Amino acid sequence: MNRSYPASSVKKNISKTVSEIAALVDGAAVGDAAISIYGVNRLEYAMPGEITFLSNPKYKKFLAQSQAGCIIIPHDFELGDEYSSRTFIRHENPYAAFVQLLRVFVPEKRYQEGFIHPSAVIGQLSVIAPTAYIGAGCVIGEECVIAGNAVLVGNVTLYDAVTIDENSILHANVVCYQETVIGSRAIIHAGAVIGSDGFGFHEVENGRFEKIPQVGNVIIGDDCEIGANSTIDCAFVGSTIIENGVKIDNLVHIAHNVVVGENTAIAAQAGISGSAKLGARNRIAGQVGVVGHLETAPDVIVHAQSGVAKSIQTGGHYFGSPAKPHGEELKILAALKHLPELVRQVTELKKLHEKD
């Protein structure tokens, strides 16, 4: 299917010369440094007047066909004669330089300080800072506290006694149950649900389940980011805790009484079962499952689709289900490829033995 792509969806009427950009990112211009740049784009779609970058060698194939006005490349990247008429910026870390430029050419949306939309509903005894922004359709329960420069974009629902600290932003349709605490500079993406009941049921007679009250809350620290449609359950008692600097992708589930250590990152579709405790700086890849009531050490990296079935005492790479040290699991997988031939050989040996 043929599909056309816009030259750029991120132009913001900002113009800088390549020379200015090179100075801004502490790089070295190669070629026509007087070219004006108006936007940013991916290498394969960038057009004249846009800047892009190349850091991963596997994307080198797009370099010749790119129409970008300027390309940020590594210091040691070799340019052939065919690029003598092109403009580049050499940089020790092209990706980091490009990220810096995103903030220049695509500045973050600024919300009007001290704005409360007429359609917002605010409960009794709630305190909203004079510089906060409350968008259309927001419902704020009783005794909530919303600190300075906090933003509730629209249709956000806060149950009673929720606290949102300064400079945090809750995107559309976020729901925070009662007594949720969100720290400073947090970003909660659309559709996330914070503080819903944990999966707590007691089996009684005839296999029937009886609900166990979930009376705790969720505490999210400073500088955290929670992805779209992710869910973090409240504690059975006490608190489910997301420590400072944690980054959670879309469609992640965090169960009741979990503790996620500081600066941990959890990728999409991972699930952390109740009362598990993840150490600081863990890296949990996509579709990882973590059994409840276990602990992981700091600096643990769990590879995609692994199942963590017991506590991990030492930092390092883990893979498989149940998760094992990465190198050990790779050896097992390599051995499995030889299993059919081993079975055949054993069968032949058994036949020979039976003849004897």
Show which residues each predicted segment covers:
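Structural signal for interior beta-strand "rungs" in well-ordered beta-sheet cores
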Residues: 53, 115-325
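Terminal amphipathic alpha-helical/low-complexity segments used for targeting or macromolecular assembly
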Residues: 1-119, 180, 185, 191-192, ...
